[in-house]
């Protein structure tokens, strides 16, 4: 029997020894952190455009609108929306002919 064959075929007891200690608090904590990391990564990839727009524009508070006429408020809202819409410039659109 070659050394390679012995390495490739671990005994059943060997696997049981490695897996039987899964009640260790460190293993449980690492598993929970790994699962949470995976979930957050998936959500980030699905909603990254929305999330980063909100962080860039949505959390900024504008000037107070107290005492400002409604027409000026609407104009300000429109300017803010246009600023958000223009931010799509770093995405590449490829059109095939």
From Swiss-Prot:
One record GO biological process:
symbiont-mediated suppression of host autophagy
The UniProt site entry described as Essential for channel activity, possibly by being protonated during channel activation, and by forming the channel gate and the selective filter is assigned to 37
The regulatory note on its activity is: The M2 protein from most influenza A strains is inhibited by amantadine and rimantadine, resulting in viral uncoating incapacity. Emergence of amantadine-resistant variants is usually rapid.
Chain intervals for the UniProt region annotation (Disordered): 61-80
- Which stretches are Intravirion in the membrane topology? 44-97
Choose one Gene Ontology CC annotation of this protein and give it: host cell plasma membrane
Q: How does this chain sit within the bilayer? A: Single-pass type III membrane protein
Q: Where in the cell is it found?
A: Virion membrane; Host apical cell membrane
Segments crossing the lipid bilayer: 23-43
Mind listing the UniProt keywords for this protein, alphabetically? Disulfide bond, Host cell membrane, Host membrane, Host-virus interaction, Hydrogen ion transport, Inhibition of host autophagy by virus, Ion channel, Ion transport, Lipoprotein, Membrane, Palmitate, Phosphoprotein, Signal-anchor, Transmembrane, Transmembrane helix, Transport, Viral ion channel, Virion
Gene3D superfamilies, sorted = 6.10.250.1640
Q: Name one Pfam family in it.
A: Flu_M2
Q: Which GO terms describe its molecular function?
A: monoatomic ion channel activity; proton transmembrane transporter activity
Can you tell which superkingdom this protein's organism belongs to? Answer: Viruses
First-listed, main subcellular location of the protein, grouped into a coarse class: virion
Q: Which stretches of this protein does UniProt put in the Virion surface compartment?
A: 1-22
Per its UniProt record, what InterPro entries does this chain match?
A: Flu_M2
Q: What else is known?
A: When the channel is activated, one or more imidazole moieties of His-37 probably become bi-protonated.
Family membership noted in the UniProt record: Belongs to the influenza viruses matrix protein M2 family.
Q: Which HAMAP family match?
A: INFV_M2
Its assembly, as annotated, is: Homotetramer; composed of two disulfide-linked dimers held together by non-covalent interactions. May interact with matrix protein 1.
Q: What is known of its domains?
A: Cytoplasmic tail plays an important role in virion assembly and morphogenesis.
Q: What does this protein do?
A: Forms a proton-selective ion channel that is necessary for the efficient release of the viral genome during virus entry. After attaching to the cell surface, the virion enters the cell by endocytosis. Acidification of the endosome triggers M2 ion channel activity.
Q: What is this protein called?
A: Matrix protein 2
Q: Which gene encodes it?
A: M
């Amino acid at each position: 029997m070659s050394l390679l064959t012995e390495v490739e075929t671990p005994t059943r007891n060997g696997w049981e020894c490695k897996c039987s200690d899964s009640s260790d608090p460190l293993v449980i904590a690492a598993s929970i952190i790994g699962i949470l990391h995976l979930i957050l990564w998936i959500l980030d990839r699905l909603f990254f455009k929305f999330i980063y727009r909100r962080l860039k524009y949505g959390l900024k508070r504008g000037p107070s609108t107290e005492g400002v006429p409604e027409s000026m408020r609407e104009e300000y809202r429109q300017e803010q929306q246009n600023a958000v819409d223009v931010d799509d410039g770093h995405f590449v659109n490829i059109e095939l002919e």
